[in-house]
Structure formats: structure tokens, C-alpha cells
């Protein structure tokens, strides 16, 4: 559980709205390298925001942590020591956010609330009030702030700029939208926005930690948006127009943030079926808090490799000219029980929950893994392996190869 051992309860953040008193604390590492390597090692442990004592009673849901944010205007105010860096070479020229950008920023916080136990509350900047997380577009030119990449987000701390997110002027006309976004590139403005919000919530780049290593094979944006290494990411082209396939927080981002703040155990807690369009590429991670759930690719014609194991990825075969390995993740501690393949020759792997796995058409390979599973090859010449548990394997059609594996298995013929 996040914050199980407090090392230090810090002072109040220095640039927050006047009635708040939002504070931070430093907690112990989780003991899991792929989580702890995403935290700063310049303190005794990772830093996180405590719930806002002024807003908590009104906005906390089921014990959620309340964190305020604000979107600075072109008349934003600062505490006198806000820009107290190593030198005084800062030049500030305010640029207001467009209304569409504000809508997209709010939508980003909605995404974060889906998988973390955080309620984000927007406060208006007026009369010296500002949120603990604060957004700007401006022309800060000091090299001490490190804006060479176009944006910066400060970690939770007690100094005035802690939690603040600053974009360079070139973002003034950018779209922070999600989905397929025209001209967004392979690392979209929304990915930059997500990256910086995650800094403001307390996580760092993989590879920054001096003693704990992030898995080297996972240092790509499809595993964590905290890296700038894109791997096999590519734009999607349709009718002569190039679109960015926009991604949000991925498997390892979610793991680190859930350690800090806990998980939203209400999100998708019922019985959910995840449908996708074969002509619409995506990169995403599923957080599902409960119920009996299904990944359904029955409307796809190309082969997919589908894994229901938490923390692992699936490679989805789209019916358009776009491909990327490992584009769909399932968060650690999320359980998806069932999966349906499409018309291609799919490879489907279950988990210990007791799965219903359907290959549909094509020559499929299905592995139930542990648990009491139901395996359906359906059409095609399939390979069906029950593995552990007491499985029921259906030889539905075609020349199937069946291996029961461990347990008391049953084979049923069509």
C-alpha cells in the first residue's frame, strides 16, 4: 500500500492556494526494482503529495487523495522566490493556454484518476491562489531550468515551483488531445503532458536512479512514457495524412504511481468487454479493478499475440498499414479473465484466474496456463494446451492438436 511507512512528513508546499496547506511526505521504496528505479534517489525515498486538508472533506471519494491543480493565465502571480535559481537570468513572457488545451489537460487528469486513488480538483488562479500542480506556457530561457526538451515538470517538494509544469512557447499551438491526432508525431504532445504530470506526481526517468536499474529491455515509450526512446513506434498514415498514435500512462508508469497513491478500485470493477476497431491503431494499458472481463478481437482479420498476464503485453494485428509490437498492456494486479481472437492465426495465453479462451477462425495456439480453463479452438487447425489446472478443451473443428498438461482435463468434441 502506498505510504505504508513515512520517513519524513515535509513542510507545506510554498506555492499553493492560500487556504490549502497541501504537504508532501517521503516514504520507503517498494522493494521492487522496476518501481523504485522510477523514483528520485536524492532523498531517502520517493516523494508524494498528501491529501489536501482543505479540499479533502468535500472531494475525497472512498478515501482518495485530493490534489489541486491550476492552469495559469497570462496574468499569473508568483511568490517572490519562485524563480530563485542558481542565477537570475530568467525571462518570463506569459502565454495563455487555448480553451481546447485546457479541456485536454482536464481530460488527462481524468485518465490518471482512472487508475490511481487520486481525486484531482481544479482551482482558479485568483487572489494569489494556485494549485499544487500548476501549468504554464512561457519563455523561461534560463539553462538552469532545463527546458531543452520543450517542457519540464517539478517533483513534489516544499519549494514554490514544486509540482509545476512549464511548456515552451512552441506548445502554444499544439493539441494535447488523445486518440489519433493529426501531425502529433510518434511522441505526441499528450505524451509530453502525461510525462510532465508524472514528474509532478513524483516519478522520474528510467535510468536516472544511480543504484537501482530499470529493466533495460523495457526502456521504450510503450512501457513507460518517462523515457524518450521510441523503439518501433511509428505514425499512422491514412488518405495521405499522418497521425500520431497517442498513448497515456503505460504499465510501469501505472505501477509506480499506484505504489505512491494506491489504485482506483472502483474503475471498471464490473464485468467489462474491451472491444477495439481493426482499422484504428492504439497504444494503451488496461487497468481493471474487478469483475469478469474479456478482450474481444473477434472482428480482427490479422493475427494477434494476446496475453492476459498482468504486467505483460499483447501485439495486435490491425487491418491497416500500421504495426507495433507490444502495443496493449495489462497493468500489474489487473485481471482479465477471457479473450477471443479473430480470423488470423492467433497466439493466446491465459492467466491463473480460470479463463475462457477462444481462437475463432485461423490456426491458433492457445495456452490456458494455470487455473481451470475452457479452451475453444473453433475453426482452423489449432494447438490447444491446458497447462495447469482442470481444463475443459473443445475440439470444435479442423485438425486440432490437444495437450491437457497437469490436472484433470476434459476433452469435448464438436
Identify the residue ranges that each predicted region occupies.
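Extracellular, beta-strand-rich repeat scaffolds characterized by small/acidic residue-biased motifs
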Residues: 290, 299-301, 310, 340-345, ...
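Disordered inhibitory propeptide/activation segment of secreted metzincin zinc metalloprotease zymogens
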Residues: 1-97, 148
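A short, flexible beta-alpha/helix-coil linker loop
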Residues: 74-79, 89-92, 171-175, 232-233, ...
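Low-complexity, polar/charged sequence tracts that form flexible coils or short amphipathic helices
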Residues: 163, 169, 184, 277-278, ...
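Metzincin-family zinc-dependent endopeptidase catalytic domain
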Residues: 25-64, 100-237, 241, 290-294, ...
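Beta-propeller domains
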Residues: 281-344, 349, 353
Amino acid at each position: 500500500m502506498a505510504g505504508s511507512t513515512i520517513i519524513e512528513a515535509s513542510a507545506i508546499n510554498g506555492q499553493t492556494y492560500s487556504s490549502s496547506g497541501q504537504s508532501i511526505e517521503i516514504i520507503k521504496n517498494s522493494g521492487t526494482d522496476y518501481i523504485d528505479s522510477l523514483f528520485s534517489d536524492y532523498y531517502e525515498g520517493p516523494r508524494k503529495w498528501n491529501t489536501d486538508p482543505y479540499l479533502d472533506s468535500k472531494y475525497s471519494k472512498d478515501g482518495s487523495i485530493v490534489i489541486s491543480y491550476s492552469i495559469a493565465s497570462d496574468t499569473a502571480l508568483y511568490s517572490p522566490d519562485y524563480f530563485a535559481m542558481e542565477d537570475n537570468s530568467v525571462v518570463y513572457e506569459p502565454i495563455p493556454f487555448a480553451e481546447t488545451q485546457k479541456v485536454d489537460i482536464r481530460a488527462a487528469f481524468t485518465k490518471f484518476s482512472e487508475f490511481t486513488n487520486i481525486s484531482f480538483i481544479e482551482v482558479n488562479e485568483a487572489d494569489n491562489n494556485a494549485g499544487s500542480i500548476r501549468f504554464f506556457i512561457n519563455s523561461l530561457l534560463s539553462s538552469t531550468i532545463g527546458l531543452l526538451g520543450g517542457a519540464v515538470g517539478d517533483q513534489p517538494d516544499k519549494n514554490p515551483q514544486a509540482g509545476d509544469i512549464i511548456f515552451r512557447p512552441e506548445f502554444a499551438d499544439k493539441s494535447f488531445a488523445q486518440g489519433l491526432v493529426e501531425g502529433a508525431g510518434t511522441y505526441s504532445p499528450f505524451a509530453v503532458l502525461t510525462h510532465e504530470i508524472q514528474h509532478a506526481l513524483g516519478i522520474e526517468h528510467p535510468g536516472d536512479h544511480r543504484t537501482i536499474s530499470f529493466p533495460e529491455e523495457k526502456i521504450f515509450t510503450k512501457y513507460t512514457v518517462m523515457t524518450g526512446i521510441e523503439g518501433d513506434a511509428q505514425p499512422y498514415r491514412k488518405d495521405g495524412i499522418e497521425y500520431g498514435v497517442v498513448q497515456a500512462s503505460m504499465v510501469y508508469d501505472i505501477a509506480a504511481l499506484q505504489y505512491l497513491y494506491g489504485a482506483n478500485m472502483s474503475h471498471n470493477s464490473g464485468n467489462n468487454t474491451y472491444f477495439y476497431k481493426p482499422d484504428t491503431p492504439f497504444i494503451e494499458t488496461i487497468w481493471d479493478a474487478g469483475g469478469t472481463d474479456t478482450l474481444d478481437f473477434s472482428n480482427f482479420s490479422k493475427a494477434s499475440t494476446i496475453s492476459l498476464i498482468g504486467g505483460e503485453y499483447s501485439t495486435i494485428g490491425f487491418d491497416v498499414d500500421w504495426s507495433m509490437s507490444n502495443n496493449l498492456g495489462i497493468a500489474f494486479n489487473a485481471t482479465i479473465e477471457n479473450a477471443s481472437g479473430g480470423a488470423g492465426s492467433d497466439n493466446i495465453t491465459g492467466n491463473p484466474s480460470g479463463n475462457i479462451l477462444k481462437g475463432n477462425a485461423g490456426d491458433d495456439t492457445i495456452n490456458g496456463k494455470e487455473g481451470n480453463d475452457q479452451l475453444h479452438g473453433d475453426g482452423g487447425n489449432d494447438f490447444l494446451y491446458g497447462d495447469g489446472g482442470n481444463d475443459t478443451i473443445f475440439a470444435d473443428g479442423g485438425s486440432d492438436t490437444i495437450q491437457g498438461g497437469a490436472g484433470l482435463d476434459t476433452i469435448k468434441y464438436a
